[in-house]
Amino acid sequence: MIPLPGGVRVWLATGHTDMRKGFPGLSLQVQEVLRRDPLSGHLFCFRGRRGDLLKVIWHDGQGACLFAKRLERGRFLWPSPADGAVTISSAQLGYLLSGIDWRNPQLTWRPTSVG
């Protein structure tokens, strides 16, 4: 994952997003739905209807970046549409991108013996 500068917030756009959208469509959604500035330097994350595709837009001060990740199996865990815009930490974003439940990360495997 790309390291984020200090002070950068990560916003999740709740609900489903049309994943055919690129920079213009997602930037417009940031402005109209999230009521945020897409050029603010914060990350804005969007999930498709099936839940296996995630897009992130970020303006780094030099230009706009668009990242996409599709899970080979499973779905990205996402807040309900009633939650509105949700902010998460950069650590939670790392969990989210790994397909881990970012709301309650838990170790799923423990070694049974050493050596």
Regions found by a protein language model. Name each.
Residues 1-115:
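Polybasic/polar functional segments that serve as interface/processing modules
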